[in-house]
UniProtKB/Swiss-Prot annotation:
Its EC number is 1.4.3.2. Belongs to the flavin monoamine oxidase family. FIG1 subfamily. One of its GO terms (cellular component) is extracellular region. It is found in: Secreted. Expressed by the venom gland. It holds the Pfam family Amino_oxidase. Catalyzes an oxidative deamination of predominantly hydrophobic and aromatic L-amino acids, thus producing hydrogen peroxide that may contribute to the diverse toxic effects of this enzyme. Shows activity on L-Leu. Exhibits diverse biological activities, such as hemorrhage, hemolysis, edema, antibacterial and antiparasitic activities, as well as regulation of platelet aggregation. It comes from Trimeresurus purpureomaculatus (Mangrove pit viper). One of its GO terms (molecular function) is L-amino-acid oxidase activity. The keyword Transferase does not apply. Signal peptide: none annotated. This is L-amino oxidase. FAD binds at residues 60-61, 80-81, 88, 104-107, 474, 481-486.
Length: 488
Protein backbone atom coordinates (compact mmCIF):
# COMPACT_ATOMS: atom_id res chain seq x y z
CA UNK A 1 0.00 0.00 0.00
CA UNK A 2 1.34 3.45 -0.84
CA UNK A 3 1.67 5.27 2.38
CA UNK A 4 3.43 7.80 0.24
CA UNK A 5 0.66 9.30 -1.79
CA UNK A 6 -1.21 10.26 1.29
CA UNK A 7 -3.31 12.74 -0.60
CA UNK A 8 -6.51 11.56 -2.03
CA UNK A 9 -10.05 10.82 -1.09
CA UNK A 10 -11.06 8.17 1.31
CA UNK A 11 -13.59 7.50 3.89
CA UNK A 12 -13.20 6.30 7.36
CA UNK A 13 -14.87 6.32 10.57
CA UNK A 14 -15.90 6.02 14.32
CA UNK A 15 -15.57 3.31 16.79
CA UNK A 16 -18.48 0.91 16.95
CA UNK A 17 -18.07 -2.66 18.08
CA UNK A 18 -16.24 -4.84 15.63
CA UNK A 19 -16.21 -8.44 16.69
CA UNK A 20 -17.97 -10.20 13.84
CA UNK A 21 -17.36 -8.54 10.50
CA UNK A 22 -15.63 -9.52 7.29
CA UNK A 23 -13.08 -6.77 7.80
CA UNK A 24 -13.25 -5.95 11.51
CA UNK A 25 -10.81 -3.05 11.30
CA UNK A 26 -12.84 -1.26 8.67
CA UNK A 27 -15.95 -1.52 10.85
CA UNK A 28 -13.96 -0.12 13.76
CA UNK A 29 -13.14 3.02 11.85
CA UNK A 30 -16.53 3.55 10.22
CA UNK A 31 -18.11 6.69 11.67
CA UNK A 32 -21.66 6.16 12.82
CA UNK A 33 -22.91 9.36 11.18
CA UNK A 34 -21.18 8.86 7.79
CA UNK A 35 -24.46 8.01 6.02
CA UNK A 36 -26.03 11.16 7.43
CA UNK A 37 -23.19 13.29 6.02
CA UNK A 38 -23.57 11.57 2.67
CA UNK A 39 -27.28 12.46 2.59
CA UNK A 40 -26.42 16.12 3.30
CA UNK A 41 -23.81 16.10 0.53
CA UNK A 42 -26.31 14.65 -1.97
CA UNK A 43 -29.23 17.00 -1.25
CA UNK A 44 -29.11 19.94 1.10
CA UNK A 45 -31.92 20.27 3.61
CA UNK A 46 -33.37 23.75 4.10
CA UNK A 47 -33.33 25.34 7.54
CA UNK A 48 -36.28 26.94 9.29
CA UNK A 49 -33.98 29.01 11.50
CA UNK A 50 -31.40 30.84 9.33
CA UNK A 51 -28.28 32.13 11.10
CA UNK A 52 -25.17 34.08 10.15
CA UNK A 53 -22.09 31.83 10.18
CA UNK A 54 -18.48 32.90 9.65
CA UNK A 55 -16.09 30.32 8.16
CA UNK A 56 -12.37 30.85 8.64
CA UNK A 57 -10.45 29.24 5.78
CA UNK A 58 -11.63 28.41 2.25
CA UNK A 59 -9.90 25.06 1.86
CA UNK A 60 -11.85 21.84 1.22
CA UNK A 61 -13.24 21.78 4.75
CA UNK A 62 -14.30 25.47 4.81
CA UNK A 63 -15.74 25.48 1.28
CA UNK A 64 -17.79 22.32 1.67
CA UNK A 65 -19.27 23.51 4.98
CA UNK A 66 -20.00 26.96 3.59
CA UNK A 67 -21.56 25.43 0.46
CA UNK A 68 -23.90 23.18 2.49
CA UNK A 69 -24.81 25.94 4.99
CA UNK A 70 -25.54 28.46 2.23
CA UNK A 71 -27.61 25.85 0.40
CA UNK A 72 -29.64 25.34 3.58
CA UNK A 73 -30.48 29.05 3.71
CA UNK A 74 -27.95 30.34 6.25
CA UNK A 75 -26.04 33.57 5.66
CA UNK A 76 -22.38 32.61 5.27
CA UNK A 77 -19.20 34.70 5.29
CA UNK A 78 -15.97 32.94 4.32
CA UNK A 79 -12.61 34.51 5.22
CA UNK A 80 -9.57 33.19 3.33
CA UNK A 81 -6.05 34.47 4.10
CA UNK A 82 -4.55 33.67 0.69
CA UNK A 83 -5.64 34.99 -2.71
CA UNK A 84 -7.25 31.77 -3.92
CA UNK A 85 -9.74 29.22 -2.60
CA UNK A 86 -9.00 25.49 -2.37
CA UNK A 87 -6.17 25.46 0.16
CA UNK A 88 -3.90 22.48 -0.38
CA UNK A 89 -5.92 21.15 -3.33
CA UNK A 90 -4.15 23.15 -6.04
CA UNK A 91 -3.02 22.56 -9.61
CA UNK A 92 -0.48 24.28 -11.86
CA UNK A 93 -1.33 24.38 -15.52
CA UNK A 94 0.54 25.70 -18.56
CA UNK A 95 -2.27 26.21 -21.02
CA UNK A 96 0.16 27.06 -23.80
CA UNK A 97 2.08 23.79 -23.50
CA UNK A 98 -1.03 21.77 -22.70
CA UNK A 99 -0.09 20.10 -19.38
CA UNK A 100 -1.23 20.36 -15.78
CA UNK A 101 -0.04 18.93 -12.48
CA UNK A 102 -1.74 18.43 -9.11
CA UNK A 103 0.39 20.17 -6.47
CA UNK A 104 -1.57 18.77 -3.53
CA UNK A 105 -3.88 15.75 -3.45
CA UNK A 106 -3.54 13.56 -6.51
CA UNK A 107 -6.11 10.82 -6.09
CA UNK A 108 -9.61 10.10 -4.81
CA UNK A 109 -10.49 6.64 -3.50
CA UNK A 110 -13.44 5.13 -5.27
CA UNK A 111 -14.84 4.32 -1.84
CA UNK A 112 -14.82 7.98 -0.80
CA UNK A 113 -18.48 8.50 -1.24
CA UNK A 114 -18.82 12.06 0.05
CA UNK A 115 -16.23 13.32 -2.39
CA UNK A 116 -17.71 11.35 -5.25
CA UNK A 117 -21.17 12.78 -4.58
CA UNK A 118 -19.80 16.32 -4.67
CA UNK A 119 -17.91 15.66 -7.91
CA UNK A 120 -21.05 14.27 -9.53
CA UNK A 121 -23.06 17.28 -8.38
CA UNK A 122 -20.71 19.69 -10.19
CA UNK A 123 -20.46 17.47 -13.28
CA UNK A 124 -16.71 16.86 -12.88
CA UNK A 125 -15.17 14.01 -14.87
CA UNK A 126 -13.05 11.37 -13.17
CA UNK A 127 -10.16 9.50 -14.67
CA UNK A 128 -8.55 6.35 -13.25
CA UNK A 129 -5.43 7.13 -11.19
CA UNK A 130 -2.73 4.53 -11.81
CA UNK A 131 -0.90 3.84 -8.65
CA UNK A 132 1.37 0.91 -9.46
CA UNK A 133 3.04 -0.39 -12.59
CA UNK A 134 4.78 -3.75 -12.93
CA UNK A 135 7.31 -2.28 -15.36
CA UNK A 136 8.33 0.54 -13.03
CA UNK A 137 11.71 0.43 -11.30
CA UNK A 138 13.09 -0.03 -7.82
CA UNK A 139 16.57 1.50 -7.51
CA UNK A 140 17.70 0.54 -4.01
CA UNK A 141 21.19 -0.09 -2.59
CA UNK A 142 22.60 0.83 -6.03
CA UNK A 143 20.83 -2.07 -7.74
CA UNK A 144 17.95 -1.59 -10.19
CA UNK A 145 15.13 -4.12 -10.41
CA UNK A 146 11.75 -4.03 -12.17
CA UNK A 147 8.80 -3.72 -9.81
CA UNK A 148 7.33 -7.00 -11.06
CA UNK A 149 10.54 -8.83 -10.18
CA UNK A 150 11.22 -7.12 -6.86
CA UNK A 151 8.72 -9.36 -5.19
CA UNK A 152 11.47 -10.70 -3.00
CA UNK A 153 13.34 -8.39 -0.55
CA UNK A 154 16.25 -10.84 -0.85
CA UNK A 155 16.81 -9.54 -4.42
CA UNK A 156 17.46 -6.08 -2.99
CA UNK A 157 20.07 -7.56 -0.62
CA UNK A 158 17.94 -7.46 2.53
CA UNK A 159 18.57 -10.43 4.85
CA UNK A 160 15.13 -11.87 5.67
CA UNK A 161 13.77 -14.92 7.48
CA UNK A 162 12.93 -18.00 5.36
CA UNK A 163 9.23 -17.38 6.04
CA UNK A 164 9.58 -13.87 4.58
CA UNK A 165 11.48 -14.79 1.42
CA UNK A 166 9.70 -14.39 -1.91
CA UNK A 167 7.20 -11.80 -0.67
CA UNK A 168 7.15 -8.15 -1.69
CA UNK A 169 7.79 -5.43 0.87
CA UNK A 170 4.18 -4.29 0.52
CA UNK A 171 2.93 -7.84 1.27
CA UNK A 172 5.15 -8.10 4.35
CA UNK A 173 3.91 -4.73 5.58
CA UNK A 174 0.24 -5.66 5.09
CA UNK A 175 0.74 -9.08 6.69
CA UNK A 176 2.33 -7.58 9.79
CA UNK A 177 -0.52 -5.06 10.13
CA UNK A 178 -2.95 -7.92 9.52
CA UNK A 179 -1.52 -9.90 12.46
CA UNK A 180 -1.99 -6.89 14.69
CA UNK A 181 -5.54 -6.56 13.36
CA UNK A 182 -6.38 -10.20 14.00
CA UNK A 183 -5.39 -9.78 17.62
CA UNK A 184 -7.65 -6.74 17.77
CA UNK A 185 -10.67 -8.52 16.28
CA UNK A 186 -11.37 -10.32 19.51
CA UNK A 187 -11.64 -7.17 21.64
CA UNK A 188 -14.09 -4.31 21.15
CA UNK A 189 -13.06 -1.61 18.70
CA UNK A 190 -12.52 1.05 21.35
CA UNK A 191 -10.03 -1.15 23.18
CA UNK A 192 -8.33 -2.05 19.92
CA UNK A 193 -7.92 1.58 18.97
CA UNK A 194 -6.44 2.40 22.36
CA UNK A 195 -3.99 -0.48 22.10
CA UNK A 196 -3.01 0.43 18.57
CA UNK A 197 -2.53 4.08 19.45
CA UNK A 198 0.10 3.15 21.99
CA UNK A 199 2.83 1.88 19.69
CA UNK A 200 4.65 3.26 16.69
CA UNK A 201 4.10 1.48 13.39
CA UNK A 202 7.70 0.27 13.30
CA UNK A 203 7.52 -1.13 16.83
CA UNK A 204 4.25 -2.92 16.10
CA UNK A 205 5.63 -4.54 12.96
CA UNK A 206 8.76 -5.76 14.71
CA UNK A 207 7.30 -6.77 18.08
CA UNK A 208 3.71 -7.88 17.59
CA UNK A 209 4.11 -9.35 14.14
CA UNK A 210 7.61 -10.73 14.71
CA UNK A 211 8.90 -9.43 11.40
CA UNK A 212 12.69 -9.48 11.03
CA UNK A 213 14.40 -6.13 11.50
CA UNK A 214 15.68 -6.27 7.94
CA UNK A 215 12.16 -6.87 6.67
CA UNK A 216 11.08 -3.73 8.48
CA UNK A 217 13.91 -1.85 6.77
CA UNK A 218 12.83 -3.23 3.40
CA UNK A 219 9.27 -2.12 3.96
CA UNK A 220 10.52 1.31 4.92
CA UNK A 221 12.62 1.75 1.82
CA UNK A 222 10.47 0.01 -0.74
CA UNK A 223 6.98 0.87 0.42
CA UNK A 224 8.26 4.36 1.18
CA UNK A 225 6.76 4.01 4.60
CA UNK A 226 9.87 5.40 6.21
CA UNK A 227 8.27 8.77 6.66
CA UNK A 228 5.46 7.17 8.61
CA UNK A 229 7.60 4.96 10.82
CA UNK A 230 7.00 7.25 13.77
CA UNK A 231 3.26 7.52 13.20
CA UNK A 232 0.96 5.65 15.56
CA UNK A 233 -0.05 2.20 14.42
CA UNK A 234 -3.69 3.25 14.69
CA UNK A 235 -3.18 5.75 11.89
CA UNK A 236 -1.38 3.19 9.74
CA UNK A 237 -4.04 0.57 10.33
CA UNK A 238 -6.78 3.03 9.48
CA UNK A 239 -5.14 3.93 6.20
CA UNK A 240 -4.52 0.28 5.38
CA UNK A 241 -8.13 -0.71 6.07
CA UNK A 242 -9.53 2.09 3.99
CA UNK A 243 -7.20 1.69 1.07
CA UNK A 244 -7.16 -2.09 0.96
CA UNK A 245 -10.94 -2.29 0.79
CA UNK A 246 -11.09 -0.26 -2.42
CA UNK A 247 -7.99 -0.56 -4.48
CA UNK A 248 -9.36 1.73 -7.15
CA UNK A 249 -8.44 5.42 -7.18
CA UNK A 250 -9.60 8.23 -9.45
CA UNK A 251 -8.38 11.72 -10.22
CA UNK A 252 -10.45 14.69 -11.37
CA UNK A 253 -9.82 15.48 -15.04
CA UNK A 254 -8.02 18.84 -15.50
CA UNK A 255 -6.85 18.96 -11.88
CA UNK A 256 -8.08 18.24 -8.35
CA UNK A 257 -8.64 21.95 -7.77
CA UNK A 258 -11.74 21.72 -9.99
CA UNK A 259 -13.70 20.52 -6.93
CA UNK A 260 -12.93 23.47 -4.58
CA UNK A 261 -13.17 25.91 -7.49
CA UNK A 262 -16.69 24.72 -8.38
CA UNK A 263 -17.79 25.05 -4.75
CA UNK A 264 -16.22 28.49 -4.53
CA UNK A 265 -18.01 29.71 -7.66
CA UNK A 266 -21.34 28.63 -6.19
CA UNK A 267 -20.84 30.84 -3.12
CA UNK A 268 -18.36 33.40 -4.46
CA UNK A 269 -20.44 36.36 -3.34
CA UNK A 270 -20.06 35.37 0.29
CA UNK A 271 -16.29 34.83 0.26
CA UNK A 272 -13.55 37.37 0.92
CA UNK A 273 -10.02 36.44 -0.21
CA UNK A 274 -6.79 37.84 1.25
CA UNK A 275 -8.53 38.38 4.60
CA UNK A 276 -6.59 36.84 7.49
CA UNK A 277 -8.60 36.18 10.66
CA UNK A 278 -6.91 37.53 13.77
CA UNK A 279 -9.26 36.97 16.71
CA UNK A 280 -12.63 35.38 17.40
CA UNK A 281 -14.42 36.70 20.50
CA UNK A 282 -17.61 35.16 21.86
CA UNK A 283 -19.95 37.36 23.89
CA UNK A 284 -23.29 35.92 25.04
CA UNK A 285 -24.82 34.16 22.04
CA UNK A 286 -22.88 36.09 19.37
CA UNK A 287 -19.37 35.76 17.94
CA UNK A 288 -17.31 38.64 16.60
CA UNK A 289 -14.52 37.74 14.18
CA UNK A 290 -11.84 40.36 13.57
CA UNK A 291 -9.79 40.12 10.39
CA UNK A 292 -7.22 42.03 8.30
CA UNK A 293 -8.17 43.06 4.77
CA UNK A 294 -5.71 43.89 1.96
CA UNK A 295 -6.29 47.57 2.74
CA UNK A 296 -4.68 46.79 6.14
CA UNK A 297 -7.86 47.90 7.91
CA UNK A 298 -9.11 45.57 10.61
CA UNK A 299 -12.72 44.70 9.91
CA UNK A 300 -15.12 42.77 12.12
CA UNK A 301 -18.03 40.46 11.29
CA UNK A 302 -20.61 39.51 13.92
CA UNK A 303 -22.24 36.12 13.56
CA UNK A 304 -24.26 33.49 15.38
CA UNK A 305 -21.44 30.93 15.10
CA UNK A 306 -17.91 30.76 13.73
CA UNK A 307 -16.18 27.64 12.49
CA UNK A 308 -12.42 27.74 12.16
CA UNK A 309 -11.49 25.24 9.51
CA UNK A 310 -7.80 25.85 9.15
CA UNK A 311 -4.78 23.57 9.22
CA UNK A 312 -3.72 22.62 12.73
CA UNK A 313 -0.77 24.95 12.82
CA UNK A 314 -2.78 27.89 11.54
CA UNK A 315 -5.48 27.27 14.14
CA UNK A 316 -2.92 28.04 16.81
CA UNK A 317 -2.31 31.48 15.28
CA UNK A 318 -5.88 32.77 15.61
CA UNK A 319 -6.73 34.02 19.10
CA UNK A 320 -10.06 32.98 20.59
CA UNK A 321 -11.42 35.31 23.24
CA UNK A 322 -13.29 32.88 25.43
CA UNK A 323 -10.03 30.96 25.53
CA UNK A 324 -10.31 27.45 24.11
CA UNK A 325 -10.17 24.64 26.64
CA UNK A 326 -6.64 23.87 27.77
CA UNK A 327 -6.89 20.35 26.35
CA UNK A 328 -7.84 21.70 22.93
CA UNK A 329 -4.99 24.20 22.94
CA UNK A 330 -2.51 21.50 23.90
CA UNK A 331 -3.81 19.20 21.19
CA UNK A 332 -3.49 21.84 18.50
CA UNK A 333 0.06 22.62 19.54
CA UNK A 334 1.20 19.02 19.84
CA UNK A 335 -0.28 17.35 16.76
CA UNK A 336 2.60 16.60 14.45
CA UNK A 337 2.31 17.71 10.86
CA UNK A 338 4.19 16.25 7.92
CA UNK A 339 5.77 18.45 5.28
CA UNK A 340 6.03 17.49 1.63
CA UNK A 341 8.10 18.55 -1.32
CA UNK A 342 6.99 17.78 -4.85
CA UNK A 343 9.32 18.55 -7.76
CA UNK A 344 7.76 18.59 -11.24
CA UNK A 345 9.55 18.00 -14.54
CA UNK A 346 7.78 18.72 -17.82
CA UNK A 347 9.01 16.43 -20.60
CA UNK A 348 8.56 16.60 -24.37
CA UNK A 349 9.56 12.94 -24.76
CA UNK A 350 7.97 10.25 -22.57
CA UNK A 351 11.26 8.38 -22.12
CA UNK A 352 9.75 6.13 -19.42
CA UNK A 353 7.40 4.59 -22.01
CA UNK A 354 10.49 2.98 -23.60
CA UNK A 355 10.57 0.81 -20.46
CA UNK A 356 6.85 0.01 -20.85
CA UNK A 357 5.86 2.31 -17.97
CA UNK A 358 2.47 4.02 -18.38
CA UNK A 359 1.63 5.82 -15.14
CA UNK A 360 2.42 4.48 -11.68
CA UNK A 361 5.65 5.17 -9.81
CA UNK A 362 9.25 4.07 -9.44
CA UNK A 363 10.77 3.92 -5.95
CA UNK A 364 14.33 4.56 -4.82
CA UNK A 365 16.36 5.12 -1.66
CA UNK A 366 18.00 8.10 -3.39
CA UNK A 367 16.70 11.54 -2.31
CA UNK A 368 13.91 11.59 -4.94
CA UNK A 369 12.25 8.60 -3.13
CA UNK A 370 9.16 8.14 -5.31
CA UNK A 371 9.11 9.31 -8.92
CA UNK A 372 5.55 9.17 -10.28
CA UNK A 373 4.81 9.37 -13.99
CA UNK A 374 1.54 11.26 -14.14
CA UNK A 375 -0.99 9.38 -16.21
CA UNK A 376 -3.03 12.52 -16.89
CA UNK A 377 -3.39 12.38 -20.64
CA UNK A 378 -2.27 15.77 -21.85
CA UNK A 379 -3.44 16.75 -25.31
CA UNK A 380 -0.06 18.02 -26.41
CA UNK A 381 3.12 15.99 -26.49
CA UNK A 382 4.19 17.16 -23.06
CA UNK A 383 3.92 14.98 -19.96
CA UNK A 384 4.81 15.43 -16.31
CA UNK A 385 7.00 13.48 -13.87
CA UNK A 386 6.72 14.16 -10.15
CA UNK A 387 9.41 13.44 -7.57
CA UNK A 388 7.59 13.28 -4.26
CA UNK A 389 9.02 13.32 -0.73
CA UNK A 390 7.13 13.47 2.55
CA UNK A 391 8.24 14.11 6.15
CA UNK A 392 12.00 13.77 6.61
CA UNK A 393 12.45 12.99 2.91
CA UNK A 394 10.95 16.40 2.11
CA UNK A 395 13.17 18.20 4.61
CA UNK A 396 16.14 17.19 2.46
CA UNK A 397 14.96 19.57 -0.29
CA UNK A 398 13.71 22.46 1.87
CA UNK A 399 17.01 24.35 1.99
CA UNK A 400 18.05 23.70 -1.61
CA UNK A 401 17.24 26.07 -4.44
CA UNK A 402 15.25 25.19 -7.55
CA UNK A 403 18.29 24.30 -9.68
CA UNK A 404 19.88 22.04 -7.04
CA UNK A 405 16.61 20.18 -6.50
CA UNK A 406 16.22 19.65 -10.25
CA UNK A 407 19.84 18.43 -10.58
CA UNK A 408 19.28 15.82 -7.88
CA UNK A 409 16.11 14.58 -9.59
CA UNK A 410 17.85 14.40 -13.00
CA UNK A 411 20.68 12.43 -11.42
CA UNK A 412 18.29 10.01 -9.68
CA UNK A 413 16.21 9.52 -12.85
CA UNK A 414 19.33 8.72 -14.88
CA UNK A 415 20.19 5.97 -12.37
CA UNK A 416 16.64 4.59 -12.13
CA UNK A 417 16.12 4.47 -15.92
CA UNK A 418 19.79 3.76 -16.71
CA UNK A 419 20.10 6.69 -19.10
CA UNK A 420 23.09 9.07 -19.45
CA UNK A 421 22.61 11.98 -17.05
CA UNK A 422 23.04 14.63 -19.77
CA UNK A 423 20.32 13.05 -21.93
CA UNK A 424 17.32 13.67 -19.64
CA UNK A 425 17.62 17.51 -19.45
CA UNK A 426 17.58 17.54 -23.26
CA UNK A 427 13.87 16.62 -23.24
CA UNK A 428 12.75 17.54 -19.70
CA UNK A 429 12.89 20.81 -17.81
CA UNK A 430 12.01 21.51 -14.17
CA UNK A 431 8.69 23.33 -14.35
CA UNK A 432 7.57 23.71 -10.78
CA UNK A 433 8.54 22.96 -7.21
CA UNK A 434 6.02 22.82 -4.41
CA UNK A 435 7.46 23.01 -0.90
CA UNK A 436 4.48 22.82 1.38
CA UNK A 437 6.56 23.98 4.32
CA UNK A 438 7.32 27.30 2.70
CA UNK A 439 3.70 28.20 1.90
CA UNK A 440 2.64 30.96 4.23
CA UNK A 441 -1.03 30.20 4.70
CA UNK A 442 -0.67 26.45 5.16
CA UNK A 443 1.79 27.17 7.96
CA UNK A 444 4.16 24.45 6.92
CA UNK A 445 2.10 21.31 6.94
CA UNK A 446 0.47 19.15 4.32
CA UNK A 447 -1.16 16.63 6.57
CA UNK A 448 -1.58 15.94 10.25
CA UNK A 449 -0.44 12.68 11.72
CA UNK A 450 -0.72 11.33 15.22
CA UNK A 451 2.34 9.94 16.98
CA UNK A 452 1.84 7.23 19.64
CA UNK A 453 -0.78 7.99 22.33
CA UNK A 454 -2.05 11.13 20.56
CA UNK A 455 -5.10 9.40 19.06
CA UNK A 456 -6.57 8.51 22.44
CA UNK A 457 -5.46 11.76 24.11
CA UNK A 458 -6.30 14.32 21.46
CA UNK A 459 -8.92 13.14 18.99
CA UNK A 460 -11.83 14.42 21.11
CA UNK A 461 -10.08 17.52 22.46
CA UNK A 462 -9.14 18.72 19.01
CA UNK A 463 -12.78 18.89 17.96
CA UNK A 464 -14.18 20.45 21.17
CA UNK A 465 -16.08 23.70 20.61
CA UNK A 466 -15.55 26.81 22.76
CA UNK A 467 -18.97 28.47 23.30
CA UNK A 468 -20.17 29.31 19.78
CA UNK A 469 -16.75 28.85 18.13
CA UNK A 470 -16.33 25.47 16.42
CA UNK A 471 -13.18 23.79 15.07
CA UNK A 472 -13.44 21.72 11.91
CA UNK A 473 -10.06 21.61 10.19
CA UNK A 474 -8.54 18.49 8.65
CA UNK A 475 -6.79 17.66 11.94
CA UNK A 476 -10.17 17.09 13.63
CA UNK A 477 -11.08 14.25 11.24
CA UNK A 478 -10.39 10.65 12.12
CA UNK A 479 -8.38 9.98 9.00
CA UNK A 480 -5.73 12.53 8.20
CA UNK A 481 -4.66 13.54 4.73
CA UNK A 482 -7.78 12.55 2.76
CA UNK A 483 -10.19 15.01 1.16
CA UNK A 484 -13.24 12.91 2.01
CA UNK A 485 -12.76 13.06 5.78
CA UNK A 486 -11.89 16.76 5.47
CA UNK A 487 -15.17 17.50 3.67
CA UNK A 488 -17.04 15.81 6.49
Amino acid sequence: MNVFFMFSLLFLAALGSCADDRNPLEECFRETDYEEFLEIARXXXXTSNPKHVVRVGAGMSGLSAAYVLAGAGHQVTVLEASERPGGRXXXXXXXXEGWYANLGPMRXXXXXXXXXXXXXKFGLNLNEFSQENDNAWYFIKXXXXXXXXXXDPGLLKYPVKPSEAGKSAGQLYEESLGKXXXXXXXXXXXXXXXXXXXXXXXXXXXXXXXXXXXXXXXXXXXXXXXXXXXXXXXXXXXXXXXXXXXXXFDEIVDGMDKLPTSMYQAIXXXXXXXXXXXXXXXXXXKVTVTYQTPAKXXXXXXXXXXXXXXXXXXXXXXXXXXXXXXXXXXXXXXXXXXXXXXIFLTCTKKFWEDDGIHGGKSTTDLPSRXXXXXXXXXXXXXXVIIAYGIGDDANFFQALDFKDCADIVFNDLSLIHQLPKEEIPSFCYPSMIQKXXXXXXXXXXITTFFTPYQFQHFSEAXXXXXXXIYFAGEYTAQAHGWIDSTIK
